[in-house]
């Protein structure tokens, strides 16, 4: 059974897609791609709730690399995510947690960061769920970049890459909108949880893959999968005052420092946002991969976290059709975005066949 959007591709775009496929030639199916992606996991940052007899539960964020638990402030809010059966943390304003070890990543090699966030029914004014990387090129550490989502009542529309302008120290921040914020979601029920993969490559690019799951008939998961590539990675590109007329000169990042969870403030600098924020609305965890994930590896890893009969390693993002013309397959079905195939039972039994040439 064939499912997906169908559109016509010019030869130049097909060549580009073919080049991307050759880079990911090391894996070709769900099993192989999951194995290669899992081998790149170097660190996880996971919220934990530990019951304490005769007292309130203790809240921690567990760092797998340092094998340590970081205590969060007593005023941290908890939101239980029934879709994932996990607890998300909303840190109080101006709060952040710095990991005790240097991040085990290299800008020269590239890396991927996965954020898991609960956004539906979990929004706060001026909120922004963020994870940042500190530079250790001077005694005054500063934020090199921050990652996260600015949630709204329809959280899947508001995923951002947040980058900080750099001088001697970062003083200001700007939001980059990676895709059309008015994209329609699938016609099922938005599950309220989002998985966002930020893949940094040595050429100074960051690829963002956002998966927002929707449920059908209380059993089947379908994804709204959006993707964008931005100049927001390493080396970092700051803009002078005013509208830029060409590509700015790169700024040397310096040595990699620790991660900062929350990013409402950093040592030796002013807060990166103009107003105080609740640092982590809906933070369910972060996974750091020590090397960049290919598109197929991202899909395979996501399927291992929340499997879907409508997501296959040979597919392309749902928003591909906005920029390409040709015949491709996405997880968003054949009708309006997100509609599953009409015969769900047959898909459940036989999975999906695709017609994507990569």
Curated annotation (Swiss-Prot):
Question: Which residue ranges does the record annotate as region Disordered?
Answer: 331-358
Q: Where is the lipid attached (N-palmitoyl cysteine)?
A: 16
Q: What's its membrane topology?
A: Lipid-anchor
Q: What is this protein called?
A: Uncharacterized lipoprotein y4eE
Biased composition, Polar residues: where in the chain?
347-358
- Keyword Cell membrane in record: yes
Q: State the compartments where it is located.
A: Cell membrane
* Annotated signal peptide: 1-15
Residues annotated for lipidation of the kind S-diacylglycerol cysteine are: 16
């Amino acid at each position: 059974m064939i499912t997906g959007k169908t559109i016509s591709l010019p030869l130049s775009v097909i060549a580009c897609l073919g080049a991307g496929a050759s880079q990911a030639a090391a894996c070709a199916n769900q099993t192989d791609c999951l194995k290669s992606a899992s081998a790149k996991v170097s660190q996880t940052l996971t919220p934990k709730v530990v019951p304490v007899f005769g007292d309130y539960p203790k809240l921690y964020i567990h760092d797998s690399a340092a094998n340590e638990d970081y205590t969060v402030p007593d005023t941290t809010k908890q939101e239980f995510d029934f879709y994932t059966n996990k607890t998300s943390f909303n840190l109080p304003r101006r709060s952040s947690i710095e990991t005790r070890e240097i991040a085990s990543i290299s800008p020269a090699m590239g890396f991927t960061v996965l954020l898991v966030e609960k956004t539906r029914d979990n929004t706060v004014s001026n909120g922004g769920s963020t994870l940042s990387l500190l530079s250790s090129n001077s005694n005054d550490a500063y934020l090199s970049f921050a990652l996260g989502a600015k949630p709204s009542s329809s959280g899947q529309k508001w995923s951002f890459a947040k980058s900080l302008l750099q001088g001697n120290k970062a003083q200001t921040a700007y939001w980059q909108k990676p895709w059309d914020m008015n994209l329609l979601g699938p016609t099922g029920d938005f599950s309220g949880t989002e998985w966002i993969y930020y893949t940094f490559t040595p050429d100074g690019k960051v690829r963002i893959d956002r998966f927002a799951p929707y449920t059908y008939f209380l059993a089947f998961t379908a994804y709204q999968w959006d993707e964008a590539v931005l100049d927001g990675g390493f080396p970092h590109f700051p803009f002078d005052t005013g509208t830029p007329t060409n590509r700015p000169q790169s700024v040397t990042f310096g040595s990699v420092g620790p991660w900062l969870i929350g990013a409402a403030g950093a040592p030796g600098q002013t807060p990166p946002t103009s107003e105080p924020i609740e640092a982590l609305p809906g933070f369910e965890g972060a996974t750091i991969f020590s090397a960049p994930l290919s598109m197929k590896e991202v899909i395979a890893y996501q399927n291992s976290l929340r499997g879907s009969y409508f997501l296959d390693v040979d597919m392309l993002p749902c928003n591909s059709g906005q920029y390409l013309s040709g015949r491709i397959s996405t997880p968003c079905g054949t009708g309006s975005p997100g509609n599953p195939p009409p015969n769900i039972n047959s898909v459940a039994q036989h999975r999906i066949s695709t017609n994507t040439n990569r």
